[in-house]
Amino acid sequence: VTCDLLSFEAKGFAANHSLCAAHCLAIGRRGGSCERGVCICRR
């Protein structure tokens, strides 16, 4: 959801990746990133 919700990039900074990482941290994971529009959390 977070990857498609705010998928924009400004000066090389992708806000959707930050939101995905924050989502993953909130559920107890070690961060994450977007891959093909899907938020993938690290284990």
Curated annotation (Swiss-Prot):
<keyword id="KW-0044">Antibiotic</keyword>
<keyword id="KW-0929">Antimicrobial</keyword>
<dbReference type="InterPro" id="IPR001542">
    <property type="entry name" value="Defensin_invertebrate/fungal"/>
</dbReference>
<keyword id="KW-1015">Disulfide bond</keyword>
<comment type="function">
    <text>Antibacterial peptide. Affects Gram-negative bacteria including methicillin-resistant Staphylococcus aureus.</text>
</comment>
<feature type="disulfide bond">
    <location>
        <begin position="20"/>
        <end position="39"/>
    </location>
</feature>
<keyword id="KW-0391">Immunity</keyword>
<keyword id="KW-0399">Innate immunity</keyword>
<dbReference type="GO" id="GO:0042742">
    <property type="term" value="P:defense response to bacterium"/>
</dbReference>
<feature type="disulfide bond">
    <location>
        <begin position="24"/>
        <end position="41"/>
    </location>
</feature>
<dbReference type="InterPro" id="IPR036574">
    <property type="entry name" value="Scorpion_toxin-like_sf"/>
</dbReference>
<comment type="similarity">
    <text>Belongs to the invertebrate defensin family. Type 1 subfamily.</text>
</comment>
<feature type="disulfide bond">
    <location>
        <begin position="3"/>
        <end position="34"/>
    </location>
</feature>
<dbReference type="Pfam" id="PF01097">
    <property type="entry name" value="Defensin_2"/>
</dbReference>
<keyword id="KW-0211">Defensin</keyword>
<dbReference type="InterPro" id="IPR017982">
    <property type="entry name" value="Defensin_insect"/>
</dbReference>
<protein>
    <recommendedName>
        <fullName>Defensin</fullName>
    </recommendedName>
</protein>
<dbReference type="GO" id="GO:0006959">
    <property type="term" value="P:humoral immune response"/>
</dbReference>
<dbReference type="InterPro" id="IPR003614">
    <property type="entry name" value="Scorpion_toxin-like"/>
</dbReference>
<dbReference type="GO" id="GO:0045087">
    <property type="term" value="P:innate immune response"/>
</dbReference>
<keyword id="KW-0964">Secreted</keyword>
<dbReference type="GO" id="GO:0005615">
    <property type="term" value="C:extracellular space"/>
</dbReference>
